[in-house]
Regions:
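Extended active-site neighborhood of metal-dependent phosphoesterases/phosphodiesterases
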Residues: 1-92, 111-135, 143-188, 192-196
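Active-site segments of SGNH/GDSL-like serine hydrolases
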Residues: 11, 94-110
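A generic structural motif
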Residues: 11, 138, 251-253
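Short, catalytically relevant binding-site loops at active-site mouths
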Residues: 103-105, 143, 202-204
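A short, hydrophobic/aromatic-rich structural module that often spans a beta strand
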Residues: 106-116, 207-216
């Protein structure tokens, strides 16, 4: 048994003990005992190469009456520890990577899940004097999203990763149409040289999927749909037809669900209308 590689875990909302209910204050450690016994501490740091990795527990469990509720924040104990850890960070570190379960920042303020982390900037203030790039790794939302954190005093990017279970194991797709997958990062020193999804279904589907069969617009004209996930406002999209660039006037951005995702969930009888990412 066991994994053939060393694994570092980050606790999430489904890792807490549901039998522990009605937690008051910011100490939810009673709901974490089983996790700690099996997998280890809920927050810690490790140095690998030129990167300082800091793993946090930003799922503050409340579980009122067994409703699985939680807040997205760091408790004071972790915040105090983070300051001490930063004080002892090796001088040759070239990048800080923060890992936690719930995203701290969202590109879409109207997204249905979750609320932004209310003390994320307080944590980042601890690292700003290091003058190092900060990368945040998160999950939870079952989508792929990249957010450049709006701070003028430091460079911070948060990557919210798709998950291996997709949209809860119904099919190997996440809510935004991204494949159910994990993400591989390659480093050279403190530089991220490549970030690539390990797509089990189609290795060519890295950031988009094309739908080009039987689709028509409101006027009845044939259209091609292109779903791009994990996009960033700095990206440049270029579409070509028979080798020729398609004029921008023929392209239109829309906010709709991925066609494949809708088909799968319709077949399962699931209502997805309430979910917004």
């Amino acid at each position: 048994g066991g994994m053939p590689i060393q694994t570092f875990h980050a606790i999430g909302n489904h890792d807490h003990d549901m039998a522990v209910q009605n937690i008051a204050g910011d100490d939810d450690s009673a709901a974490e005992l089983a996790y700690i016994s099996a997998l280890g501490p809920t927050y810690y740091a490790v140095n690998i190469g030129k990167v300082h990795y800091v793993v946090f527990d930003n799922t503050q469990y409340v579980n009122t009456g067994g409703d699985r509720s939680f807040a997205v924040r760091l408790n004071r104990r972790q915040m105090d520890w983070a300051q001490k850890d930063a004080d002892y960070m090796p001088s040759d570190v070239e990048r800080i990577v923060i890992a936690w379960h719930c995203p701290a920042f969202r590109r879409n303020p109207g997204a249905s899940s979750p609320n932004p982390m209310d003390n994320a900037d307080e944590l980042l203030d601890i690292y700003k004097d290091k003058q190092l790039p900060v990368t945040i790794w998160s999950g939870h939302n079952h989508i792929a999203e990249t957010v450049t954190v709006p701070r003028s005093d430091m460079s911070v990017t948060e990557y919210t990763h798709p998950c291996v279970c997709g949209a809860w194991w119904y099919f190997p797709l996440c809510h935004d149409g991204a494949p159910a997958t994990f993400t591989r990062y390659d480093f050279s020193g403190g530089t991220i040289t490549e970030r690539r999804s390990v797509n089990f279904s189609d290795s060519d589907e890295q950031y988009c999927r094309v739908y080009n069969s039987g689709l028509k617009n409101a006027e009845g004209r044939p259209v091609v749909r292109l779903n791009v996930w994990d996009w960033h406002p700095t990206w440049k999209f270029e579409c070509r037809e028979n080798g020729a660039a398609v004029p921008a006037s023929q392209l239109k951005a829309v906010r709709e669900y991925d066609d494949y995702y809708v088909t799968v969930h319709d077949a399962c009888g699931n209502d997805i209308s309430s979910f917004s990412f």
